Amino acid sequence: MRAELNNGLIDFLKASPTPFHATATLVQHFEAAGFQRLDERDTWAIETGGRYFVTRNDSSIVAFRMGRQSPLTGGIRMVGAHTDSPCLRVKPQPELQRQGFWQLGVEVYGGALLAPWFDRDLSLAGRVTFRRDGKVESQLIDFKLPIAVIPNLAIHLNRTANEGWAINAQNELPPILAQVAGDERADFRALLTDQLAREHGLNADVVLDYELSFYDTQSAAVVGLNGDFLAGARLDNLLSCYAGMQALLNSESDETALLVCTDHEEVGSSSTCGADGAMLEQIVQRLLPSSEDYVRTIQKSLLISADNAHGIHPNYAEKHDANHGPKLNAGPVIKVNSNQRYATNSETAGFFRHLCMAEEVPVQSFVVRSDMACGSTIGPITASHLGIRTVDIGLPTFAMHSIRELAGSHDLAHLVKVLSAFYASHELP
């Protein structure tokens, strides 16, 4: 099971270079399992035992399985994750021609660790909006090939490079795509038009706009002398999206189960398709006949917010509280913060720990050092919007927000096992 899950995750990561592609890949899995697509603009006819999914902005998805008994009776078991990861996004007018090279101006999306982006074989993917035959259409594209690179400055010209230096995102991050000769002018939109034709056979009249990100073409892999680790891009947080999907597809229960994977977590979640928007609340409201039933159901429900946790690094152990250093391959981590940066409380943490014990899954705890600021997740946001009890958990990870992160190769199976047990559980606290 472990090898099968890890290989499946590697394939999932390869197919999901952007939130748009991640959502499309999730859709493929759910449709293959018989889930029915719902359109928010239509009237819904939800059936007992039915399986459905809804997407918004092509970058967020809510998938759910209606239980054989009403959610008003047993509540809803929810797992939440996010589809986005820190990256470099192409600007609207990105063309740069400097010293005979064609480069693209980029914005830093989220809290990216920038140094690892240098000297990597980069490709480009995302969503393009264009006009064709008088109509506005959108399509996902993925160049797949390594078409760009951000070369480092040689140490001979930067003698203090190994002493640390501040990276200037405006000047130092534009990737190089090609050399240009003489008066030749680079045309990025023409490149996108060609890609639409090459990848999809679409003859666009004009490219109107786009949301495109660079990504590392190196595939994720199981690494280490004994295969102990899983290395790859976007483990934060596509690892949790994949685990939640596997758990939802492979668990059976009389209760209603739901997976929500939203966009824009890395930049605050404030969007129509982010956790700070109304998407999840609006969808859950449509599953229940009245506002009173909605409130009653939410109070019987529970959310597991799944997002990667900081594993204790052997070279930087002092960055962790000595008693709360999660180890790779030692199971999922319960995240706790008294200032509500995580939504965990003693009741929800206790229930998650109970699930882990029942499934013989190891479990750990994380609290940030008292002299360091704590990050956050969709957990507190969703708990606030819905009023739902929540526990924040995640798998230990090194190099979070790097272009290539590292997790334990045993932990994905641990997480899928406990999330499956959660979806199948007959009683909530």
UniProtKB/Swiss-Prot annotation:
The enzyme class is hydrolase
GO molecular function terms listed in the Swiss-Prot or TrEMBL record: aminopeptidase activity; metallopeptidase activity; zinc ion binding
What CDD domains does the record tag this protein with? M18_DAP
Q: What cofactor does this chain's UniProt record say it requires?
A: Zn(2+)
Where is Zn(2+) annotated to bind?
82, 156, 401
An annotated GO cellular component of this protein is: cytoplasm
Give GO terms for biological process.
proteolysis
Q: What is its EC number?
A: 3.4.11.-
The protein's matches in InterPro entries, at most eight in alphabetical order, are given as: M18_aminopeptidase_2, Peptidase_M18, Peptidase_M18_dom2
The entry's keywords:
Aminopeptidase, Hydrolase, Metal-binding, Metalloprotease, Protease, Zinc
Q: What family does the database annotate?
A: Belongs to the peptidase M18 family.
The molecule here is called Probable M18 family aminopeptidase 2
According to its UniProt entry, this protein's organism is: Pseudomonas savastanoi pv. phaseolicola (strain 1448A / Race 6) (Pseudomonas syringae pv. phaseolicola (strain 1448A / Race 6))
